[in-house]
Amino acid sequence: MIKGLPEKLKEQREKYHYSQKYVADQLHVSPSIISGYETGERTPSTEKLLALSYLYHCSTDYLLGRKHDDPETMI
């Protein structure tokens, strides 16, 4: 699991007052998948990460904890 991703996903979901079921319905997965993302037991695919960023109105960089000016997070 990518460090910090589970926390960011839960933080964003709660920010918009979305239930795990609502997010799961939007991504066409089960609520247990969303729970797994938020606990770090599962890692979302690139496709699901993009869908989550769209749903949460944020960039994938934000969800991944990347900062453009931070050399430690640059690939």
What are these regions (language model features)?
Residues 1-15:
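A short, Lys/Arg-rich alpha-helix, primarily the initiator
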Residues 7, 17-18, 44-47:
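Residue-level signal for the short linker/turn that defines the boundary of a DNA-recognition helix
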Residues 14, 25, 54:
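Alpha-helical residues within the helix-turn-helix
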Residues 17-36:
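Short alpha-helical DNA-recognition segment
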Residues 38, 48, 67:
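DNA major-groove recognition helix of helix-turn-helix
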Residues 47-62:
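DNA major-groove recognition helix of helix-turn-helix/homeodomain DNA-binding modules
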Residues 64-75:
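Short, charged recognition helix plus adjacent turn
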